[in-house]
Amino acid sequence: MARAKAEIQPVAENRKARHDYFVEETYEAGIVLVGSEVKSCRAGRVNLRDAYAQIKDGEIFLLNCHISPFEQANRFNHEPLRPRKLLMHKSEIHRLYGKVREKGFTLVPLRLYFNQKGKVKVELALAKGKRAYDKRDDIAAREAKREMARALRGRYDD
């Protein structure tokens, strides 16, 4: 019998990114890791909070992504905050480079996950920073939606 396709479970999510940025487009990129980093990812010991991507010499690198050292890897362990190369098509990199050069755009990782083949992937977002009043507007809209749902729920209980 064939195995059922497993849901893609994120190893790490950057929930703060959706709060701090307007996400314009998302891209999927592979990531170059060493063995101890993959094992730490499988254990879920990844933090994307302050991570961002930068394009240097036609290549994309993920910076400030913290992957905790793997305990059993003793002296062959990796450095937790090293820059990690992302794997994307050259045309996508050129398109992103053109967008990032525009004022206000940045590359932010949204989540890190294993695909069906067991490869580690990064969901990368082309994002524009939110201002304080944009964040307040989002909070007000969320509260209004919650109030409407509460009012509707109370109306049908009669």
Swiss-Prot record:
Keywords annotated in UniProt: Cytoplasm, RNA-binding
Query: In which compartments does the protein localize?
Result: Cytoplasm
Decide whether keyword Nucleotide-binding is in the record: no
Keyword Cytoplasm, does the record have it?
Answer: yes
Q: Example GO biological process term?
A: trans-translation
Its primary localisation, in coarse terms, equals: cytoplasm
Record protein name field: SsrA-binding protein
